Amino acid sequence: MGLEFGEHNPRAATDIVFKALPIVKSNLGAELGIESMMQLANVFRGNMEERQGWGYHDWGSWKAYFKTIRKIGQLKRNVNVNKVLTNDFIAPANDFDVSQVKADAQKYSLSAELSKVDIDKIKGRFYSNVVK
């Protein structure tokens, strides 16, 4: 639910993190903090058309990951994905009122500092730091 909230209002999600962890605010500042929150939401959200909700595990991706880290020596033996992952909790974990979360995110009262951050500017450069 928290990532859904952040998807609808990354500035508000950043404010909540800053209040809970002031060191994050002092280390990142408003703009980088918001951009980081947006990147996290983007990665964790993925393509919701292909997924069955927040937290859904794609077996093929996990198999490839475990195979790769085994190949580079990070694991000593193969991992059976079926023994370490489950999607059994995805449906109940995603059983919340998305429209209410969106409404709560949109009405969140922002500080002046976070209100000034231009989300469209961040989106415009969102992939400019991608390693090619």
Feature-to-residue mapping (PLM):
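Conserved C-terminal helix/tail region of periplasmic/extracytoplasmic solute-binding proteins
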Residues: K63-K132
